[in-house]
Amino acid sequence: MSGRGKQGGKARAKAKTRSSRAGLQFPVGRVHRLLRKGNYAERVGAGAPVYLAAVLEYLTAEILELAGNAARDNKKTRIIPRHLQLAIRNDEELNKLLGKVTIAQGGVLPNIQAVLLPKKTESHHKTK
């Protein structure tokens, strides 16, 4: 009658998460909320949580890739803290980044000092 109401109005577009817009698995909305609640700054830009989520996702993927390789080397199909420890400590850059981090149930890297190894003598080769 008077042209009011929702006749012929456009249907609202399907909601799309910021993570899917950015092509990420990590939750951009949650990272944004945590940045706002954490009192890091008075205001948080729209791109900051996307960038931070992307960085966190990349680091996680890198560590899991190396830990998966460590698990496969040990003939295991499940990644355990020991595999994470081996992955991080054997990678120079990750070891520097996570140098002060302790991983529970991670153990230590196998390492025997060179002076403790048996000496290789050539006495039995020269028996003339």
Swiss-Prot record:
The modification Symmetric dimethylarginine is found at R4. The modification N6-glutaryllysine is found at K96, K100, K119, K120, K126. One of its GO terms (biological process) is heterochromatin formation. The keyword DNA-binding applies. Its main location: nucleus. The modification N6-(beta-hydroxybutyryl)lysine is found at K10, K14, K37, K96, K119. The modification Phosphoserine is found at S2. InterPro entries: Histone-fold, Histone_H2A, Histone_H2A/H2B/H3, Histone_H2A_C, Histone_H2A_CS. Deiminated on Arg-4 in granulocytes upon calcium entry. The modification N-acetylserine is found at S2. There is a cross-link at K14, K16, K120 (Glycyl lysine isopeptide (Lys-Gly) (interchain with G-Cter in ubiquitin)). The modification Citrulline is found at R4. SUPFAM superfamilies: Histone-fold (SSF47113). Residues 7-19 have a biased composition (Basic residues). The modification N6-lactoyllysine is found at K10. The modification N6-succinyllysine is found at K10, K96. The modification N6-crotonyllysine is found at K37, K119, K120, K126. Gene3D superfamilies: Histone, subunit A. Belongs to the histone H2A family. Core component of nucleosome. Nucleosomes wrap and compact DNA into chromatin, limiting DNA accessibility to the cellular machineries which require DNA as a template. Histones thereby play a central role in transcription regulation, DNA repair, DNA replication and chromosomal stability. DNA accessibility is regulated via a complex set of post-translational modifications of histones, also called histone code, and nucleosome remodeling. This is Histone H2A type 1-J. It comes from Homo sapiens. The lineage of its organism: Eukaryota, Metazoa, Chordata, Craniata, Vertebrata. The gene is H2AC14.
